[in-house]
């Protein structure tokens, strides 16, 4: 196969050449290298440099670039696994060339995780991570990192597929990006609590075609109970933008929308707890200033968003609110400022360019939009 030399971060490796004219992903080469996931890898490398797990498993590695970078840039022992023999040949070639404490295995990911344990496990499959979560929930000692690229089922666009895979009810709401991330994390939490284990999210986000979450795995029964208490539902009005959060419930409690008088519908179960460990994100932000990554500007922007966002479980798209009100959308910064001045913490959100995360109720947001229109669009 035709290969080329590539550098990501401070790591140089060899990867197969992809035919960019064919469907991508999964690409045309025998072994897949996804250039579009460099940001994902950069963020994980930076996080791993901060938390320093004892070791790391790249469970479905393909070219192995993620594990190679962790070994080279975070300087911890790494196991890189793939069940494809051609992939393993490339990984071994790169590992020998790179040096460092790297073990390479050719095995089914579930079988490997059923027979070995690792301090940190990274699941980055093509599609859903669900088939691997059970084994990973038992095999990960302290850290579990998970990517899902099946965004349509998680966001509710492919409703039945989302129900089947995640045993949850997705809804294609205006805040569907956060629903998708929280539904994936809710599934992670439910897998862990089965084994009397809990989780504490460190770094979680949505970007383009995937969701990504890095969590601490906690081994005590009390942690499992605390994790279970963070599972819940968003109850959404099917006729308007009203929603309410229900945390700590394994079944949804129906309510009547105070605006429309119709019964709300459940979204979930979802992870309703914090998405970030902001002390770690602050350390990442400080460290990033002295480091070089190919996606450094994107990383800086993402960390700034994540550090600022309030811990609400949904966001509002103020363009959709304005459209429903049949008025012009206000200037975003002026809307945010007016809500903060009213005593409700409000920021932009990484989930949506026209989204705001706020502790304010919907009627107040509508009032601020109406006032802005009255002030700025007078004839």
UniProtKB/Swiss-Prot annotation:
Enzyme Commission code(s) on record: 2.1.1.216
Record key words, sorted: Metal-binding, Methyltransferase, RNA-binding, S-adenosyl-L-methionine, Transferase, tRNA processing, tRNA-binding, Zinc
Catalysed reactions listed for this entry: guanosine(26) in tRNA + 2 S-adenosyl-L-methionine = N(2)-dimethylguanosine(26) in tRNA + 2 S-adenosyl-L-homocysteine + 2 H(+)
Domain spans labelled Trm1 methyltransferase: 4-369
A biological-process GO annotation: tRNA N2-guanine methylation
Binding site for S-adenosyl-L-methionine: 41, 66, 82, 108-109
Region: Disordered, residue numbers: 1-26
Annotated positions binding Zn(2+): 237, 240, 257, 260
Example GO molecular function: tRNA (guanine(26)-N2)-dimethyltransferase activity
Stored PROSITE patterns: SAM_MT_TRM1
Stretches with biased composition (Polar residues): 8-25
Family classification: Belongs to the class I-like SAM-binding methyltransferase superfamily. Trm1 family.
Chain's role: Dimethylates a single guanine residue at position 26 of a number of tRNAs using S-adenosyl-L-methionine as donor of the methyl groups.
Name of this chain's protein: tRNA (guanine(26)-N(2))-dimethyltransferase
Gene behind the chain: trm1
